[in-house]
Every structure is written in structure tokens, then in C-alpha cells.
């Protein structure tokens, strides 16, 4: 094990709520759940498909009685500081600048969706102190409706089965989009032979089918298409194997927590001699998984970090024999200013696992070990350093035998040289070969003042919260390699991997903020395409194209008029991942618009407004919303995009959309 010595929607959603509730210790919270017979969450199962288990057991639940916990009282105690009610004349957030959904707008979600978010999704840390009955009571109150006499099994699990169980094709012989960035370099570029779409085709695209995710408040994960199958993870903890042309379902796998990002597919051979293709992914409780791509059979599960705040929000990377697993700890980032919490102890990391067995080969932390600091003013113990989470998928450089990761900000002093940085790790040992810090001294925690005393769990001086949310993209100009990535500061960077990450160029594409340029660029042979988020500014949105060689501006496109008008959470911000094909670049916006631009001059080629309800092939009530965390996927003449990844900053939705030519 190696130890180095030295938001966006999810950021705001979880950290704001962290500040708003009276957290007990993590151990106390688990003890309380154990006392109520709940214990740790551990459910996982194959549902449906070739090797389907018996019908899902339906949990019985009774109507709320006078003896049940008061959802209103619990909501007011732990939620209302941020999710307060609208005042007369208000149309958006309950808390200006934070934009957490007000109580009135939470009623758009079912109690099942809210309960899933509290139990398995992004709010599980905030609900850690609640019993199952208390979480249900909050879900009923927040949604404004009851569960009814029973909790139905998810609508999308037992329906929409494919009539034929086709054998998967050879991944190398059929078009694919594998993983978050469409390959280990994470360029998000799809060549014509794989995409089978040209810029001239895009205006003729039509909606072919829609798939609704049940019991979720957001559609954040991006799909993966390999071997003639589409793999769609969900925040409800399911992975769906679908027919990419019809949306029918081959199988569904139930993980132990919500899955917030894309899967990657690679070959495996287990100890029993079984072999084939595996779907690799991670969840919000820091579990990594391998599931057979043909049948949905579980191959292995590995918890890669025991810290209660640990979560996997970046996709896993696969190099043929290993999977690389990034871990971040957002749930602790909001605790520095909270009295009574012993902040902070989480450390970001990457683990290399044997792809066949899930065995940990090595684990490298991004920062040094925690040490006790001066107690807080209330006598609570405090620790540091902390933070340095890895939000995004690792990037693999087979030529140099390195894996690159981008790190987040620190949570607590002392500042480290490896936060807000790109690190190069040896693929065999995890040893850090070099690091390049882009913003020094960026220790930041929600609820802290700009300047804080020595006996505070907060950093002495708050940094700007400019962590790196997107992965480094490995590309080249001639015989020179570059690592290109955006930062929340509003800067795009090109680093030289041959010179230990020395900066080759930088370009300011946005004003920058804690919700600045966010989730990823696309790179083709000539250009870097960057979307502008700037969600905290009066004029968010817009697109830029830069030369790969030196970062010179080629064209820029101002934001278009918002498709969502004055709707709460509506923004023109374009911080989501971009996708490039020959002649065009696609991007989903916070206003719910999926747009395609010409790579020549930035002119608009096509727009589709996802702000509506959809008739889903699986019968789930589906609707679109903001698009931010997940990017478009182009493969085999189709375009796939998840709409509704607004978190608590934008507008929620729960739909996967598939477009094709007439």
C-alpha cells in the first residue's frame, strides 16, 4: 500500500445537506440502525434475465399511524434549514446561492424515490442517524403522499423483457462506446466507423425509445454500449442490460447502493473457469463490482474503502487485467464547520483490483495520513490532512506504464501538494511518479468562514474550491503527447506527461467558481471542445473550441436562450461532458437541451428539448430535466443520453433517451 507524504449538483446537494443536519458519529448512527434490526445495507441480487431468481419479495408496509415517527418534525429538524418553504414571489431555491429544492418542489417526487435517495443515494449520509421508520416518515412528508398499503417492487424490474436472449457479439467486431470516455485515454471522441453518424445526419435524428428509471430523483449515470448490448446503471442501484435498438431488457442486477456513473466492459476468467465479458462499476458506498455481461451473474464484489464518507462517483478504468477504482469523500467535505463532528479523516484514493477476482493489488492514497490537531472550540477532536478525493475515471497511458488521476480539494489543514492536482501512478505498484498541482492551498469545507482560528476543524484560510472534477484526457499533436483537462477555476490546461506534468498551455474559458467548468471536455485530432458552466454567475453557458497544440481559441458560441424558461432550477450552464464525432460536437445543457454544434465554426446543427414527459418502453412514468453529469453516447448510428441529472442545483428527471435515423 502506497502513501504519498504530502459542484456542482452533487457537491451542493450533499454538502449543503451535511451542514444542515445534526450528525451523530458514524459509529453511533450504525449502532442505532443495528438496535432497530436494520444492520448494514448488503442486498444484492440478479433480477430477471436468463438466470433470473424467483419473483422479488415485496416488503409489507402499513399506513402511518399516530405512533409512527413524525415526518414533519424530522424534516424540520434535519432538512428545513436548506429545504425550507418558498416565500411569496419566490420561484426557485429555498436558500439563495445554494439552490436546494424547497419543500414545495419536493412533492414532484414519489415517496419511493425520496426513500431511495435517503437509503442508497446521495443523501444516505445525511440520513445516517435515522431509523428505517424515520426515513419512511420523511419520505411521506416530503413527497406529500403515502406509500399506500404495500411498497411495490420497482416497476421497471419485472417488465419489458426481451423475447430473445441473444448472445453478445465480439466487442472488437461491433461498434461500441466503452466506459465513460470511450476508451482508456478518455477523449470522448467517436470515429465514424464506430459512431456511424456524420454531422449531416444529426438534423434527421428522431427519438426511437425512452427508458424510465423508477424510484430515483436523478438520471446521472451514462450508458455503455458493447457487443450489441447497452448497460445502463441507475441511482436506484440497478444495472439494466438493454437491447440498444429497442430498449427491451435482458437482465437487471441489483447492487448494494446507488450507481452514479458509467460502467466499463472487459474480459474476465474466474477461479471456476467461467469466462466472458464482465461489466465493471462502482456505487455510492465504495463497493466495486464485476457482473457477467451476458447473464447478469455476479462475479465479485469488493469494498475498496471502509470510511463512512467514501463513495465511487468516477467510472472504473480497465487495462486488460486490472480495474482502477477512484474514491472520493464528498459526504465529509461539508462537515468542517459543523460543531461536534471530529473533522476530517477521509483521504482520496485509487485502488487497482484484479479484474478476474476483485483482489486488491495496490491502493494509493492521494494525501498523507491524518494526525490529531488542536481540538475545536467545543472540545471536539479534529484531524488533518483530509480530502483529495478522486471524482473522475482514471486515464491509462500504456506507453509510459502510468495511470493518471485528477484530485479534489483538501478538507482540513495542513495543505497538501497533491490536492487540485494531476498524479501519475505506476500501473503495477501504484507508486506516485510525479504530481502537478494546479491550485495550491485549496482546503475548503462548507460552513467554514473565510478565516478561521487555530482551534477550529475548518482550514485556517478557505481555498476557492477549484478541485478537478474531470479526468485528464490523453491526446497528442504529432509525436508529442498531452494531458488536457478543465478545472472549476474556469481554466483549461494542457500538461506534458513526458516532463512530469509541466504546463504546456492554459486558456480561460469561464469565470470559474465552486460550480465552474465541471465534468469533462472532448478532444478530436485538432481541437479541444469545452462547455462553460459558470452556474453561480449571471451569464452561465456557452461553448469554446481550442487548438490542441497551443490552446488558441478557434471559435466560441454564446449560450442560447434557455429552453426551460423561468422554471425553478433552470440554467443555461453547460458543464456536462461533451462528445465529439467527425464534424460535430454534442452537449447536454442544464436547460434540458441536447445540442449538436459544427466543429468548424460552432454553428448549431440540431437541438432536442428533453423538458417533457416520455412514454417509456418499460412503463415507468418518465420525464426529462437538466443534463450535467452524464454526456451523450454515440454508437452504431444511435445517440443515447440520460436526462435529469440536475441534482439539487438543476431540475431532476429519470429518463434514458435513444435517438436514431428514420
Model-derived regions, located:
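Extracytoplasmic electron-transfer domains, predominantly the class I c-type cytochrome c fold
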Residues: 96-146, 177, 402
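Short, solvent-exposed loop/turn elements at domain surfaces
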Residues: 90-91, 184-191, 215-221, 240
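Bacterial N-terminal signal peptides
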Residues: 9-20
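Extracytoplasmic/lumenal domain signature
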Residues: 199-214, 239-259, 265-275, 280-310, ...
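Blade/loop signatures of beta-propeller domains
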Residues: 157-208, 366, 370-371
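Periplasmic/extracellular electron-transfer cofactor-ligation site
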Residues: 68, 72-108, 145-150
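Electrostatic cytochrome c docking/interface patches
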Residues: 32, 39, 43-74, 89-90, ...
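Asp/Glu-centered strand-loop micro-motifs enriched in Gly/Pro and often flanked by an aromatic residue
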Residues: 67, 191-226, 230-231, 253
Amino acid at each position: 500500500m502506497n502513501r504519498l507524504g504530502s459542484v456542482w449538483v452533487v457537491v451542493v446537494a450533499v454538502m449543503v445537506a451535511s451542514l444542515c443536519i445534526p450528525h451523530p458519529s458514524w459509529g453511533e448512527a450504525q449502532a442505532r440502525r443495528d438496535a432497530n434490526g436494520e444492520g448494514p445495507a448488503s442486498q444484492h441480487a440478479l433480477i430477471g434475465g436468463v438466470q433470473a431468481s424467483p419473483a422479488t419479495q415485496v416488503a409489507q408496509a402499513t399506513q402511518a399511524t399516530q405512533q409512527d415517527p413524525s415526518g414533519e418534525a424530522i424534516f424540520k429538524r434535519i432538512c428545513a434549514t436548506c429545504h425550507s418553504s418558498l416565500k411569496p414571489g419566490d420561484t426557485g431555491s429555498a436558500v439563495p446561492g445554494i439552490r436546494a429544492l424547497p419543500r414545495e418542489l419536493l412533492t414532484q417526487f414519489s415517496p419511493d424515490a425520496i426513500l431511495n435517495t435517503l437509503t442508497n443515494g446521495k443523501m444516505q449520509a445525511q440520513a445516517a442517524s435515522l431509523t428505517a421508520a424515520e426515513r419512511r416518515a420523511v419520505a411521506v412528508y416530503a413527497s406529500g403522499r403515502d406509500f399506500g398499503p404495500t411498497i411495490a417492487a420497482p416497476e421497471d424490474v419485472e417488465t419489458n423483457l426481451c423475447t430473445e436472449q441473444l448472445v453478445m457479439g465480439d466487442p472488437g467486431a461491433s461498434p461500441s462506446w466503452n466506459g465513460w470516455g470511450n476508451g482508456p485515454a478518455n477523449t470522448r471522441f467517436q470515429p465514424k466507423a464506430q459512431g456511424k453518424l456524420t454531422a449531416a445526419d444529426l438534423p434527421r435524428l428522431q427519438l426511437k425509445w425512452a427508458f424510465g428509471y423508477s424510484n430515483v430523483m436523478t438520471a446521472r449515470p451514462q450508458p455503455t454500449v458493447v457487443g450489441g448490448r447497452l448497460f445502463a446503471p441507475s441511482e436506484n442501484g440497478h444495472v439494466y442490460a438493454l437491447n440498444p435498438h429497442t430498449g427491451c431488457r435482458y437482465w437487471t442486477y441489483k447492487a448494494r447502493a446507488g450507481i452514479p456513473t458509467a460502467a466499463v466492459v472487459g474480459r474476465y476468467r474466474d477461479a471456476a473457469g467461467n469466462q466472458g465479458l464482465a461489466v465493471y462499476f462502482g456505487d455510492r458506498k465504495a463497493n466495486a463490482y464485476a457482473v457477467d455481461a451476458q447473464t447478469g451473474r455476479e462475479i465479485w464484489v469488493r469494498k475498496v474503502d471502509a470510511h463512512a464518507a467514501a463513495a465511487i462517483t468516477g467510472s472504473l478504468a480497465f487495462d486488460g487485467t486490472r480495474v482502477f477504482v477512484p474514491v472520493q469523500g464528498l459526504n465529509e467535505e461539508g462537515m468542517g464547520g459543523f460543531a461536534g463532528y471530529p473533522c476530517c479523516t477521509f483521504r482520496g484514493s485509487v485502488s487497482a483490483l484484479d479484474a478476474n477476482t476483485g483482489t486488491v493489488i495496490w491502493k494509493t492514497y492521494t494525501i498523507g495520513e491524518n494526525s490529531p490537531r488542536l481540538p475545536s472550540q467545543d472540545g471536539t477532536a479534529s484531524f488533518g490532512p483530509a480530502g483529495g478525493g478522486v471524482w473522475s475515471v482514471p486515464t491509462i497511458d500504456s506507453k509510459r506504464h502510468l495511470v493518471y488521476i485528477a484530485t479534489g480539494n483538501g478538507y482540513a489543514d495542513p495543505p497538501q501538494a497533491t490536492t487540485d492536482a494531476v498524479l501519475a501512478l505506476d500501473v503495477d505498484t501504484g507508486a506516485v511518479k510525479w504530481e502537478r498541482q494546479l491550485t495550491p492551498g485549496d482546503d475548503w469545507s462548507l460552513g467554514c468562514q473565510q478565516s478561521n482560528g487555530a482551534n477550529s476543524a475548518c482550514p485556517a484560510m478557505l481555498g476557492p474550491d477549484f478541485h478537478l472534477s474531470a479526468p485528464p484526457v490523453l491526446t497528442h499533436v504529432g509525436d508529442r503527447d498531452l494531458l488536457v483537462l478543465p478545472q472549476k477555476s474556469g481554466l483549461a490546461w494542457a500538461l506534458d506527461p513526458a516532463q512530469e506534468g509541466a504546463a504546456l498551455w492554459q486558456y480561460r474559458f469561464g469565470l470559474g467558481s465552486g460550480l465552474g467548468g465541471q465534468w469533462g471536455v472532448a478532444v478530436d485530432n485538432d481541437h479541444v471542445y469545452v462547455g462553460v458552466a459558470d452556474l453561480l454567475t449571471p451569464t452561465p453557458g456557452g461553448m469554446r473550441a481550442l487548438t490542441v497544440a497551443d490552446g488558441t481559441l478557434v471559435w466560441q458560441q454564446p449560450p442560447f436562450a434557455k429552453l426551460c424558461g423561468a422554471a425553478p432550477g433552470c440554467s443555461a450552464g453547460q458543464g456536462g461532458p461533451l462528445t465529439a464525432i467527425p464534424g460535430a460536437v454534442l452537449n447536454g445543457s442544464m436547460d434540458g437541451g441536447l445540442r449538436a454544434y459544427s466543429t468548424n465554426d460552432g454553428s448549431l446543427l440540431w437541438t432536442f428539448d428533453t423538458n417533457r414527459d416520455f412514454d417509456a418502453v418499460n412503463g415507468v412514468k418518465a420525464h426529462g430535466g437538466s443534463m450535467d453529469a452524464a454526456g451523450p453516447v454515440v454508437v452504431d448510428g444511435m445517440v443515447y443520453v440520460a436526462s435529469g441529472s440536475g441534482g439539487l442545483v438543476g431540475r431532476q428527471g429519470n429518463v434514458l433517451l435513444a435517438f436514431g435515423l428514420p
